[in-house]
Each structure stands twice: as structure tokens, then as C-alpha cells.
Regions:
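Conserved catalytic network of the ASCE P-loop NTPase/AAA+ motor domain
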Residues: 20-23, 91-94, 108, 118-127, ...
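Conserved nucleotide-binding/hydrolysis micro-motifs of P-loop NTPases
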Residues: 3-4, 33-38, 89-91, 106-107, ...
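Conserved GTP-binding G-domain of TRAFAC-class P-loop NTPases and closely related GTPase folds
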Residues: 47-65, 83, 166-186
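Loop/turn-to-beta-strand initiation segments
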Residues: 26-27, 79-82, 96-99, 122-128
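Conserved RecA-like ASCE ATPase "motif II neighborhood" in helicase/translocase motors
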Residues: 78-115
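Conserved P-loop
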Residues: 1-77, 137-155
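Conserved catalytic/switch belt of AAA+ P-loop NTPases
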Residues: 59-60, 67, 114-127, 131
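Conserved coupling/interface region of RecA-like P-loop/ASCE motor cores
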Residues: 149-198
Length: 203
């Protein structure tokens, strides 16, 4: 659900592990789709300039995690403990010695999810954060990609699933009330079959 702190929790745990050297990995890699413009090659500027609008949420999260430290997100990048990469740039690389956070994974089709998984190299761990109820994908075939992907992961001993519920919403009381009300109405019905499939895998 929206507002449960999925990305915040994942970043906190990853940063705590990297900074305190409690894991063998050396850095954090955040991966995110550039949807609705997956192919960002036509945008002006270098990679940093093209992706800046999508890294802004992480700037805010780092400021919350490190109050009083100027530009903590940029500092982490310059210290080489953090990197950001759009899915468009994943093909052909091998990600080693990293904690990989795939954020907003509900906006990835199966091809993108599959590509990311095949990039994971030695001494790396990968985490997927997302909420299929917030997907920006409109093509039903693309929406079903995450179902197929989770069915594959469900059969792997290396993976575990953590599901957040309505009572886990912490962004605001208003949002929590809204989500609970929305889930009772027709607006959630389009996702009912997806919900049942995913929860059957989690159960």
C-alpha cells in the first residue's frame, strides 16, 4: 500500500548495513524504471541530468535519514556507497558486491524484471519494493508481468516476501482512511484478480 514506508525502510536497513560494515557488500544500487519515458535517450543532457527528476524522492529520504547533514544523497554518491541506475541502462552490465534496491517495481514489465535479475553478480543481494495497486502500466499484459515474475521467485529458496497491510500505513491518518475506504469500493476491483494471485503466493 501507499505510505507504508517501503522504500524508507529498505534504504535505512541497507545504509545501516553498509555504513556499519555488517554485510560483505560495498555499496547500494537503486534501480528504477523511467516510466512513462522508459527510453530516456532523447532527453537533453547527460545521464545525471536525465535522471534527476527520478532521484528527487531519494534526496528527500536521505535528508530525513541524515538530518543536519548538507546534501546527504550527493555525499553518499560521491563517497561511492550509492549509485542510481535506470532500467534502460542495465543491459550488458554485471552488478557485483552491491545491495540492489529495485524501487517501484510495479512499473516494470516482465522483460525489465527479467533483465535486472540476470544482471546480479557475485556477492550481491537484490530487493524489490513496490505496490501493484499503484502501477502506472496500462497494458494488461505488462501488468501481469509482475505476477509471472513473483511466481518464479516464489519457487526460489533465496527469496522471501514481506507484505504490508492497511494498518502499516504511516504517511498520514488521512491517507490511511482513504486507502481503507477505496479498498471497499469499486476502484480496487480492477486489481482484484491480481491481488488474489499475489496474496496466494505470499500466503
Amino acid at each position: 500500500y501507499a505510505g507504508t514506508g517501503k522504500t524508507f525502510i529498505m534504504l535505512y536497513l541497507a545504509l545501516n548495513a553498509i555504513l556499519n560494515r555488517t554485510v560483505p557488500q560495498e555499496k547500494i544500487l537503486i534501480v528504477r524504471s523511467m516510466l512513462p519515458i522508459r527510453d530516456i535517450g532523447f532527453l537533453p543532457g547527460n545521464t545525471e541530468e536525465k535522471t534527476s527528476v527520478y532521484t528527487e524522492p531519494y534526496n528527500a529520504l536521505f535528508e530525513e535519514l541524515f538530518p543536519g547533514i548538507p546534501n546527504p544523497y550527493d555525499l553518499a554518491k560521491y563517497s561511492d556507497i550509492l549509485d542510481f541506475m535506470p532500467t534502460s541502462y542495465m543491459r550488458g552490465i554485471t552488478v557485483r558486491d552491491s545491495l540492489v534496491i529495485v524501487d517501484e517495481c510495479q512499473n516494470l514489465n516482465f522483460h525489465e524484471l527479467d533483465t535486472i535479475m540476470t544482471r546480479v553478480g557475485q556477492n550481491s543481494k537484490i530487493y524489490f519494493c513496490g505496490d501493484f495497486l499503484q502501477t502506472d502500466l496500462r497494458n494488461p499484459q505488462e501488468q501481469n508481468g509482475i505476477i509471472k515474475f513473483m511466481e518464479i521467485l516464489h519457487d526460489m529458496k533465496s527469496f522471501r516476501t514481506i507484505a504490508f497491510k492497511e494498518h502499516d500505513i504511516v504517511r498520514s491518518g488521512l491517507l490511511k482512511e482513504y486507502i481503507i475506504s477505496k479498498n471497499k469500493k469499486e476502484y480496487a476491483m480492477n486489481f482484484d484478480s491480481i491481488d488474489k494471485k499475489l496474496r496466494s503466493k505470499i500466503a
